[in-house]
Amino acid sequence: MTELKAKEPRAPHVAGGAPSPTEVGSQLLGRPDPGPFQGSQTSEASSVVSAIPISLDGLLFPRPCQGQNPPDGKTQDPPSLSDVEGAFPGVEAPEGAGDSSSRPPEKDSGLLDSVLDTLLAPSGPGQSHASPATCEAISPWCLFGPDLPEDPRAAPATKGVLAPLMSRPEDKAGDSSGTAAAHKVLPRGLSPSRQLLLPSSGSPHWPAVKPSPQPAAVQVDEEDSSESEGTVGPLLKGQPRALGGTAAGGGAAPVASGAAAGGVALVPKEDSRFSAPRVSLAEQDAPVAPGRSPLATSVVDFIHVPILPLNHAFLATRTRQLLEGESYDGGAAAASPFVPQRGSPSASSTPVAGGDFPDCTYPPDAEPKDDAFPLYGDFQPPALKIKEEEEAAEAAARSPRTYLVAGANPAAFPDFQLAAPPPPSLPPRVPSSRPGEAAVAASPGSASVSSSSSSGSTLECILYKAEGAPPQQGPFAPLPCKPPGAGACLLPRDGLPSTSASGAAAGAAPALYPTLGLNGLPQLGYQAAVLKEGLPQVYTPYLNYLRPDSEASQSPQYSFESLPQKICLICGDEASGCHYGVLTCGSCKVFFKRAMEGQHNYLCAGRNDCIVDKIRRKNCPACRLRKCCQAGMVLGGRKFKKFNKVRVMRALDAVALPQPVGIPNESQRITFSPSQEIQLIPPLINLLMSIEPDVIYAGHDNTKPDTSSSLLTSLNQLGERQLLSVVKWSKSLPGFRNLHIDDQITLIQYSWMSLMVFGLGWRSYKHVSGQMLYFAPDLILNEQRMKESSFYSLCLTMWQIPQEFVKLQVSQEEFLCMKVLLLLNTIPLEGLRSQSQFEEMRSSYIRELIKAIGLRQKGVVSSSQRFYQLTKLLDNLHDLVKQLHLYCLNTFIQSRALSVEFPEMMSEVIAAQLPKILAGMVKPLLFHKK
């Protein structure tokens, strides 16, 4: 026995180059099962490893099974246990083990390279196995993982003796007429526990050797040889993609072959973690194709473990049908039950991160046939095309998933047909160049399964939100939402999926969310179980808006009949009933009641677009209240218990939330015909109520006698606080933040005085019936105090506004809409940067004012007259506010002489904008010509 030391092995994973035979031999003789990941050198640079004594004699060539002699007729003795132990790295062979002889390492290195080069390199025409150039021409070699595929015909290892790593063929050693077999690249990312031998098209899977009923003892051939017909090479995890189908290709990795005829085959361990059925090796018997090496073969294709729970009963039945009905011809291997078919989303997908779903590329040396049978177990990473918003994804992630229900398989009954929706358009199918994939002759028992599946269909999980898809018909089908130009609502309504079993069986049109079907079976990855009402357990979170009863009806009536039940329209939680006119949960019901009765002034810290769901519904009360008002919740709606009888009048047909707000057209204008239904406050007006500022105090000391300077100073401090309140209110105003930031600042600076005096008139009208000027709770001026002040004439001018409110009996809804229009009533002469958005927003609030008028006026004539009176009041405010601007600017200029204090922010606005306004550099927007 010869004891050698291998020095400086190169990394076997070097792309584009082959490792030296020394490192191949040293790794082949390593410990067979070190763990799931065998340590290896991965860098290009060579690294010095510890000297490993390698016992060549008796380990490189295993003796054939008992009862057979080597070709030269010698009789061999089985190796001692010490010889076998000497093959493990880190274990020194005993000095007297066998008849070993020591050679200097420098002499043995060349001999070892020559022997391993001859042994491991595949033979080819005109090639010498002892030539080092041959090793360089061959693709990089690689090593087996700890778990190898099992060969049922191989003789198992017994009595703790390890199975030999290589098998010597019985044929003459000098035969070199065979050609290098084409090899397949193991997909990258494949875990070591799934490293299986890949089939080579046209190669025999295992030599025709009958399995021995008795365990064969492992014997080692001590004879030296210079040539070997087969090639033994393990698969490499993470090997680069193969560019060609031959072993001579620069990027192709050779595939380890099975045992030669008469040799002891490889007996790897079975991995019990994966119970997926595999094609029996006993059926992979095919003649040797001309020009192929009998050893260049494989066991079975790699297995993709299903990522979803399976119907075990159906899978077992389908596997039994495959095993009983498969046939092989022409040396082509059958398609694995877990191999993706051509045209599947994963067949041509990009590399997937992770080790369970590798990126597979096969050399184009065998084209699969078109009649390959689509199997149930074709699981690949699903190609998901999800166009959902964030709350939809989170709602789906929180929902329990029921993939396959237990029970009878629908495919077992020929008369049972599931209405599978037509799959969405996919990219053109690219035929995969996959060696070893051939047609599978389906048995009669499998015909019922294939009859319910579309040709070439696999697991296609394509969940998409089809905004442009035609709406389906059915009891829960939404009516199409027209574009704004065609007289439709401005709300981004999302359709509800019609997933009832009766609707699908009756052949209804496909839902907007197509169900996930697998060969006509219940869908995977989506709810298969439904509620007793026929509605799915999980709904889309976009159920904020009501659906119209009929598209053809001219009156914009809305009902709850088309809404799903048992789901809160605000947060998506389980609804407890219809509260305040909307189907909500108990939490949202209590929140809305407290928010509306307590008159809280909630402000959003973000952009008024916070997500309101079951988990985050308490984060932002402002957005939650906005969503409640948007859904149509009103305190007067508590009396309506039967939600399928409630009608919401003119609520969602004109103005939309979220932003932007659309421009009205002829078909969208509100008519003033009397309605027979119960009239509720429109949602946008409810939102305006919720964002109305709280009561602001002036901080005036009423215990001291009034002076001109003290009153003006208190009014200036009140104006500063009201100016800050206007800024916060405008930011919460729907549509205002869609404008350019410069336009927002300009509009506030031009309109802050109008908003203050208009609010003064409303407070005076509501609290003191217009008899006094109600500036603040701590600053109320009656007529006597007005006369004592230095601005009595100005007080009389401001007093006209509450008197007009008393005369017209302005409602709160009308006041809120008029207040927004005052913000949008003055623009620069050159216009705004976002002029189109401004006009769109202003037109929308004009229509809101019309709807607010329609809540009280029942006739067209009376409603039109009131609209004229209110808009005339807005026009008259321009002249009144101009007087206030002039007085304010004069007081600001003489502030030191008058001992009047002006706060900083108010001073900046007065100095920057009032001269422009008084100079006529602004353009007032009037409703009526003077």
Swiss-Prot record:
Phosphorylated on multiple serine sites. Several of these sites are hormone-dependent. Phosphorylation on Ser-293 is highly hormone-dependent and modulates ubiquitination and sumoylation on Lys-387. Phosphorylation on Ser-102 and Ser-344 also requires induction by hormone. Basal phosphorylation on Ser-82, Ser-191 and Ser-399 is increased in response to progesterone and can be phosphorylated in vitro by the CDK2-A1 complex. Increased levels of phosphorylation on Ser-399 also in the presence of EGF, heregulin, IGF, PMA and FBS. SMART domains: HOLI, ZnF_C4. There is a cross-link at K387 (Glycyl lysine isopeptide (Lys-Gly) (interchain with G-Cter in ubiquitin)). GO terms for cellular component: chromatin; cytoplasm; nucleus; plasma membrane. GO terms for biological process: glandular epithelial cell maturation; lung alveolus development; maintenance of protein location in nucleus; negative regulation of gene expression; ovulation from ovarian follicle; paracrine signaling; progesterone receptor signaling pathway; regulation of epithelial cell proliferation. It comes from Oryctolagus cuniculus (Rabbit). It comes from the Eukaryota. The gene is PGR. Keywords: Cytoplasm, DNA-binding, Isopeptide bond, Lipid-binding, Lipoprotein, Metal-binding, Nucleus, Palmitate, Phosphoprotein, Receptor, Steroid-binding, Transcription, Transcription regulation, Ubl conjugation, Zinc, Zinc-finger. Composed of three domains: a modulating N-terminal domain, a DNA-binding domain and a C-terminal ligand-binding domain. Residues 1-133, 148-260, 334-356, 415-454 are annotated as: Disordered. Residues 1-165 are annotated as: AF3. This is Progesterone receptor. Progesterone binds at R763. A motif (LXXL motif 2) lies at residues 116-120. Residues 457-547 are annotated as: AF1. Residues 166-304 are annotated as: Mediates transcriptional transrepression. A motif (LXXL motif 1) lies at residues 56-60. Residues 566-640 bind DNA. There is a cross-link at K7, K387, K532 (Glycyl lysine isopeptide (Lys-Gly) (interchain with G-Cter in SUMO)). The modification Phosphoserine is found at S20, S82, S131, S191, S212, S293, S344, S399, S673. It is found in: Nucleus; Cytoplasm. The keyword ATP-binding does not apply. Signal peptide: none annotated. Residues 187-204, 431-454 have a biased composition (Low complexity). Residues 676-910 form the NR LBD domain. Belongs to the nuclear hormone receptor family. NR3 subfamily.
